[in-house]
Amino acid sequence: SRGLGDVYKRQLQGFEKKLDSFLTENSISLSDNQYDALISLSYNIGSGWMKNSALSALLKSGFYSTNELASAMGIWCHVKESGGDYVIHDGLVSRRMAELRVFLYADYSGSSDGFYWVRFVQTEKGDRARDIAFYEAGSTYDPSFDATSNTEVFLGWYTESGELLTDLTATENRTVYAQWESDFYD
């Protein structure tokens, strides 16, 4: 309806104003497609990312790799469950990848092709730096994200089939699990 269209237009104008302020305050220049991608992100998740997030820090610095940017945008793919926990939402994963394609390549097709995700599963023995990262297809998993523990030695990320992840090239979506020294010597 026309009324609903007016509501959406006002919401978008509000996000444009906030993004314009963020860009001006931080002397950031963007291309039209980069601006469009950040408006799409803001419309979906709000403007909180403009405060103290990895994405805002990268944009402020002006120096970032494709994968750093991908993971900084990709981390915004969670929804809150009724119990209060935040979980990865597959639809938002696809949306973030499509926004990346707009930001990086001016590709407005809505496709999420060209990127893969790695999900880092939480373990009881330690903490992980993040629960998901995005990587451009064919690239190396860089930046990489480790797991840490005050009492355990981290041995690496293992696949669902129990094999150490040694091929660090983004060729498919993967779920990996932290393995600890005590897992082998208990």
What are the residue ranges of the model-derived segments?
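Short, small-residue-biased leader/transition segments that mark boundaries at the very start
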Residues: 2-8
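Short amphipathic alpha-helical surface patches that mediate protein-protein
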Residues: 40-43, 74, 162
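Extracellular/periplasmic catalytic domains that process cell-envelope and extracellular macromolecules
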Residues: 30-34, 65, 169-172
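Long, amphipathic alpha-helical surface segments
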Residues: 16, 24, 48-115
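Secondary-structure capping and domain/repeat boundary segments
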Residues: 112-186
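Active-site nucleophile-His-acid catalytic modules used for acyl/amide transfer and hydrolysis
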Residues: 10-53
